[in-house]
Amino acid sequence: MSEQLVVVNAENQILGRMATHIAKLLIQGKRVVVVNAEKAIISGPRARVVRGYSLIFSVRKFQNPEKNTIKRPRTPINIVKRTVRGMLPKNKSGKMMFKNLIVFIGIPAEYKDKQMIRFEDADVKRLKGKYITVGELSKLLGGFSQ
């Protein structure tokens, strides 16, 4: 299985639709690098999206919270990774595929000159309603300050 490098620009891309394409690339055995993760889009009114992501923070357990509670991603990198991880197989091969995913905030110097792909069906132009960026969501959840 040859490992090809695919660089995906997440700017103005709908997170869920982009994640399905990334999961398909990972299943094909390719290495995927996602840049501009903080500029990905989540559709829906801001209040509803934030409420959905922060709902799990209120879950409490009687055991050690570091070991046994539900952990919710707060940074843009982890939000994108978690979304893609949910679309991969839940077995050993899925774990190996997930290791081929790298996510960055902004564009690192080593990937500036690489050809970046965008997914047409994941473009923000499809949306008629409201949306929020992953960076804004992360700031509201307390995980991103830039």
Curated annotation (Swiss-Prot):
Q: Subunit arrangement?
A: Part of the 50S ribosomal subunit.
* GO biological process, alphabetically ordered: negative regulation of translation; translation
Keyword Protein biosynthesis found:
no
**Superkingdom classification of source:** Archaea
- Record key words, sorted: Ribonucleoprotein, Ribosomal protein
Q: Which HAMAP family match?
A: Ribosomal_uL13
Which InterPro entries does the record associate with it? Ribosomal_uL13, Ribosomal_uL13_bac-type, Ribosomal_uL13_CS, Ribosomal_uL13_euk/arc, Ribosomal_uL13_sf
Recorded family membership: Belongs to the universal ribosomal protein uL13 family.
Of the GO CC terms on this record, one is: cytosolic large ribosomal subunit
**What Gene3D superfamilies does UniProt report for this protein, alphabetically?**
Ribosomal protein L13 (3.90.1180.10)
* GO MF annotation list: mRNA binding; structural constituent of ribosome
Role noted for this protein: This protein is one of the early assembly proteins of the 50S ribosomal subunit, although it is not seen to bind rRNA by itself. It is important during the early stages of 50S assembly.
Name it. Answer: Large ribosomal subunit protein uL13
